[in-house]
Each structure stands twice: as C-alpha cells, then as structure tokens.
Amino acid sequence: MAAATMALSSPALAGKAAAKVFGEGRITMRKSAAKPKPAASGSPWYGADRVLYLGPLSGEPPSYLTGEFPGDYGWDTAGLSADPETFAKNRELEVIHSRWAMLGALGCVFPELLARNGVKFGEAVWFKAGSQIFSEGGLDYLGNPSLIHAQSILAIWAVQVVLMGAVEGYRIAGGPLGEVVDPLYPGGSFDPLGLADDPEAFAELKVKEIKNGRLAMFSMFGFFVQAIVTGKGPLENLADHLADPVNNNAWAYATNFVPGK
C-alpha cells in the first residue's frame, strides 16, 4: 500500500510548467519547490553552527550540507546528498516515509494497549489483524460489525488506492490551481491548526517531525523483526522482556532463532 502511494509522491512535477486552456485563452502556471525560510540565527538546528551528528567530535561536514534543511546533522558518509536532484528526491522520500512510519508505529502499539486494558475490538496484534479478512466471517473494523464489514481484500486495496492517491495527487499537484508551492509542507487544508503560521516555530516543528520520523522508521523495522522472530506484538514482547529480561532479549532470540519454528 505504501509503495502504491509512494509512486504518487515523485517530485518530478516540481519546476515544470502546467498549462490550462479556458476557451481561446491560455493560462500557464509554474510550480517550483520552495526554498525554506531561514530559521532564527540562534537556532541550534540550522546553519553552519548547527548541532552535528557527533557533537564536538564531529568532523567538517560536506560542503553541500549547509544546514539549510531540517534534520541536517552534517553526516553523509556515502555521499548520497552530493547530487542536488538526488538529494531533493531522497529528502522528500524520507519525510513521506517518516510520516507513514509515525502513523504505522502508533497503529501497531495503540490497539494492543487498548486490548491490554480491557477494550475488546477483535484482533489487536498489528500483523494478525489484517489477516482476519481472509477468515470466513471477514473483518469487522474495530471489532464492530455495525461499522465496516470487509470481506474483499481487493475492494479494500482499491478504496485505499483511490482515496490515498487522490490526497497525494492533490498535495503533489499543489491543489486544483497549483497554488501550493511546497508539496512537502502544503499548508492550507493540510494545516487546519495553523501550526505553520509562525516561521520560527514551524522551522523547529520540521526538525521535531524528521527526528521523530526517523525513530519511527527504526521502530517499524524492529516491529517487523519481532513479528518474524517471536510471532508477538510489540507490547507483548515488551512485557515478556520486563518479566524475564535474561531469557527474553535480542541476543537470546538471535542465538536461538530457527526460521519456520
């Protein structure tokens, strides 16, 4: 699902002219990615004096990492950001994947948390919940048959592609008239709380988003590994570890794991 949506997230439209014809007149609009507004000079997250990946022990950052964008700690050992076009593409992919990962991590943990506190709504373990659609009775959203009773995986896939693709297409295209300049931070209807109204606060929120997003991507990777190795959800694994940390830890599972058992 994420792959289908990410296919719609390409920045290839940025910088290209879009022409619309009304009657005999022609209106041409050009959308280009906006350069971020400079953060406050005292911000520790931007500029040449920003915090680097190893603090005072960090070496000189590459010349192309200037601290202009959020999450730039001056570390690029593989030189992945040396090419400006590649950097722009990877930056967009990272932000989008970060947002997906934050939503996914919450979705993995929250149902288990509710179930462990007495809330009954069907299967709570994230990697088992979706498989209920293949059962004879199908899948009830939140365990309630009066909400959405799903019986076709193809129907769910089609609905998600249409709805999520429409939102992503709207974001990338800059709205119906191309008025949104930066597809990564479109604002407007995507910012109903007005969090981007203050430029300095918005610059700091961008840093918080990318930092939490990177942690969430690592978390999701850990959840996948746990599901394969233990066959349990993240909270159940945490409870097992706290109850018996000697026998329930990464090292113990890594040295005793046998695929298929």
UniProtKB/Swiss-Prot annotation:
UniProt cross-references to InterPro entries, sorted A to Z: Chloro_AB-bd_pln, Chloroa_b-bind
Location of the protein in the cell: Plastid, Chloroplast thylakoid membrane
Binding-site list for chlorophyll a 4: 212
Binding-site residues, chlorophyll b 5: 160, 257
Binding site for chlorophyll b 3: 152, 168
Binding site for chlorophyll a 2: 97
Keyword terms, alphabetized: Acetylation, Chlorophyll, Chloroplast, Chromophore, Magnesium, Membrane, Metal-binding, Phosphoprotein, Photosynthesis, Photosystem I, Photosystem II, Plastid, Thylakoid, Transit peptide, Transmembrane, Transmembrane helix
Positions where N2-acetylarginine occurs in the chain: 30
The keyword Transmembrane appears for this protein: yes
Chain residues that bind chlorophyll a 6: 241, 250
Details of cofactor binding: Binds at least 14 chlorophylls (8 Chl-a and 6 Chl-b) and carotenoids such as lutein and neoxanthin.
Modification note: Photoregulated by reversible phosphorylation of its threonine residues.
Membrane topology classification: Multi-pass membrane protein
A GO molecular-function descriptor: chlorophyll binding
Sequence positions that bind chlorophyll b 4: 160, 171
Transmembrane annotation, as ranges: 95-115, 147-167, 215-235
Protein residues bound to chlorophyll b 1: 53
Binding site for chlorophyll a 5: 208, 226
UniProt: chlorophyll a 3 binding residues: 132, 142, 209
Residue sites binding chlorophyll b 2 per the record: 99, 148, 177
SUPFAM superfamilies given in the database record: Chlorophyll a-b binding protein
Subunit structure and binding partners: The LHC complex consists of chlorophyll a-b binding proteins.
Described purpose of this protein according to its UniProt entry: The light-harvesting complex (LHC) functions as a light receptor, it captures and delivers excitation energy to photosystems with which it is closely associated.
UniProt note: domains: The N-terminus of the protein extends into the stroma where it is involved with adhesion of granal membranes and post-translational modifications; both are believed to mediate the distribution of excitation energy between photosystems I and II.
Assigned protein family: Belongs to the light-harvesting chlorophyll a/b-binding (LHC) protein family.
Protein name: Chlorophyll a-b binding protein 2, chloroplastic
Species this chain originates from: Oryza sativa subsp. japonica
